[in-house]
Design a protein with these regions (language model features):
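Transmembrane-helix boundary motif in ABC transporter permease subunits
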Residues: 2-31, 48
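Generic hydrophobic transmembrane alpha-helix motif, especially the helices
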Residues: 31-68, 75-76
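Short cytoplasmic-facing helical segments at TM-TM junctions of multi-pass membrane proteins
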Residues: 72-117, 138, 142
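Transmembrane alpha-helices
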Residues: 59, 63, 95-129, 156, ...
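Short helix-capping/hinge motifs at transmembrane helix termini and TM-loop junctions
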Residues: 17-22, 46, 50-52, 64, ...
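Generic alpha-helical transmembrane segments of integral inner-membrane proteins
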Residues: 4-12, 16, 62, 66, ...
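Glycine-rich helix-loop "coupling/hinge" segments at transmembrane-helix boundaries
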Residues: 48-49, 124-161
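C-terminal transmembrane helix and the adjacent membrane-cytosol boundary/short C-terminal tail
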Residues: 21, 78, 109, 156-168
Length: 168
């Protein structure tokens, strides 16, 4: 769920940033600044706001996924072949039609690249969410194994996490 929401919100944000120079000037510095905040620091806050349930885990995954998708897709949108844009201008294509028919299709490989990165990070976000406040799940199992010095259980949980990430 976090992967899907992060991909949709990241894609829409990238389109909005590419379409509006004002949004680009205002929002892009905040996006870059947000990456300076360690994700681990957000986990307790999200747990306080959203509770110990699934919501905080989804929010953590969404936050981790959002930036790679937004960044990759935005970069691809801005690198659309200038010849294609010039041809569209000559043909009288303007505004959102240029975005919809030329820029977005040309930038889909960049979106896919960001999504591939995000798919690797999604389980990490969920695990971080479980570390803060869960009574079950892989993150909880890892904390339990760590607290009881059970390295075999810790490595087993890490292997399951790695396999799960590769499957995504």
């Amino acid at each position: 769920i976090g992967l899907a929401l992060g991909a949709v919100l990241g894609g829409l944000s990238a389109i909005g940033l590419a379409a509006s120079p004002i949004a680009r000037a205002l929002v892009r510095p905040m996006l870059v600044f947000s990456q300076a905040i360690p994700v681990f620091a957000l986990a307790p806050i999200l747990t306080l706001w959203l509770g110990y349930g699934l919501g905080s885990k989804i929010a953590m995954a969404l936050i981790i996924i959002y930036f790679p998708v937004t960044s990759s897709f935005f970069d691809a949108l801005m690198r659309t072949n200038p010849e294609w844009l010039g041809l569209a201008r000559v043909m009288g294509v303007k505004g959102w039609r240029v975005m919809w028919h030329i820029r977005i299709p040309a930038a889909l490989p960049g979106f896919a690249s960001g999504l591939r990165l995000a798919a690797v990070y999604a389980p990490i976000g969920a695990i971080i969410g479980e570390w803060v406040g869960a009574s079950k799940g892989l993150g909880y199992l890892m904390l339990l194994a760590n607290g009881r010095a059970k390295t075999d259980l810790m490595f087993a949980a890490l292997i399951v996490l790695a396999v799960f990430t590769l499957v995504l």
